[in-house]
């Protein structure tokens, strides 16, 4: 929820009680449960208000609800710090929102080694640690899980030592395996939990650990399972699965195959094309695209047609290899060679 509309982005301001912030935000939204853009359905608002009735959440406080939204470079960064009654400091990073810039930054994870949100996450975590004493929990969902992991790995040693738990909820991996071979990663591993649904798509992107815990979702496809509200609960426990489905294994291998197969010039071409296409829509968010679908599609097509010839030829090369990759990956999963292929990739 957009608590940044209620809570200051400064660590120097007084923390705001969770119940007060939630009531104010609900009132700001007309005292009605409404979706937040096209992605977050109205159930997120319903859950927020239900939480205000439970003792577990009532005494929490919020501080430094930060929202950074920029273009060139594309940045969509959101973070908030929750202060628990026992003194624990919970630093939460939000995933991708409704904005097209946010989605572009997601694509940047695939084509660039560094994105602005990585440094923003590291700096934010260090500020929270400097301001408050106590154990620290770091967590996030989707891109939020990705930057939570990055911030926890690359913050100062004295901050890492205070981290009690690091939770990555179906967030993607890094651009290469060197990140998870660092001493920082090995140091953090006993505190680290990576949760993914059984047919995970986002959580299988790029180079990630294989120590993830598989969660049972009510849905049956990766993108739909990415919604945390579909993850099943039994009492106070999350329902686990013994492993990924074949679809989840396919997603893991094919996404790494596609991205790892790109050279630097191909990544640059893909980046230029995505930037041109998204700018061409003339829209700010996904809801705007939905409401102005005809104009958005026309703008996108027009912008894509204007992409230079060399870039278009490079895009054709990229997608020409896609069929082969899909076929070989599907065959590997069918033959039960998932672990063998994964070991080969890591080498």
What are these regions (language model features)?
Residues 139-144, 148:
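Gly/Ala-rich beta-loop-alpha elbow adjacent to hydrolase catalytic centers
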């Amino acid at each position: 929820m957009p608590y940044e509309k209620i809570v200051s982005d400064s660590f120097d301001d007084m923390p705001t009680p969770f119940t007060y912030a939630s009531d104010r935000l609900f009132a700001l939204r007309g005292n009605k449960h409404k979706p937040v853009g096209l992605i977050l359905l109205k159930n997120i608002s319903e859950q927020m208000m239900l939480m205000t009735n439970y003792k577990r959440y009532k005494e929490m406080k919020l501080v430094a609800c930060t929202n950074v939204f920029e273009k060139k470079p594309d940045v969509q960064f959101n973070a908030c710090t929750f202060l628990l009654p026992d003194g624990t400091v919970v630093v939460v990073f939000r995933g991708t929102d409704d904005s097209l810039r946010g989605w572009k930054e997601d694509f940047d994870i695939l084509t660039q080694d560094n994105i602005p949100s990585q440094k923003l996450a590291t700096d934010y975590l260090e500020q929270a640690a400097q301001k408050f004493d106590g154990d620290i929990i770091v967590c996030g969902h989707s891109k939020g899980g990705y930057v939570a992991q990055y911030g926890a790995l690359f913050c100062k040693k004295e901050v890492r030592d205070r981290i009690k738990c690091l939770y990555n909820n179906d967030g993607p991996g890094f651009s290469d395996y060197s990140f998870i071979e660092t001493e920082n990663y090995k140091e953090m591993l006993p505190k680290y939990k990576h949760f993914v649904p059984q047919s995970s798509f986002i959580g299988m992107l790029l180079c990630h650990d294989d120590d993830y815990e598989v969660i049972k979702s009510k849905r049956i496809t990766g993108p739909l399972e990415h919604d945390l509200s579909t993850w099943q609960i039994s009492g106070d426990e999350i329902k686990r699965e013994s492993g990924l489905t074949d679809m989840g294994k396919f997603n893991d291998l094919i996404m790494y195959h596609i991205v790892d197969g790109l050279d630097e010039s191909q990544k640059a071409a893909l980046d230029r094309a995505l930037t041109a296409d998204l700018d061409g829509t003339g829209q700010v968010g996904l809801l705007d695209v939905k409401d102005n679908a005809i104009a958005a599609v026309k703008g996108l097509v027009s912008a894509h047609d204007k992409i230079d010839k060399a870039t278009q030829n490079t895009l054709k090369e990229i997608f020409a290899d896609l069929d082969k990759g899909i076929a070989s990956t599907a065959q590997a999963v069918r033959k039960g060679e998932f672990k063998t292929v994964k070991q080969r990739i890591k080498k």
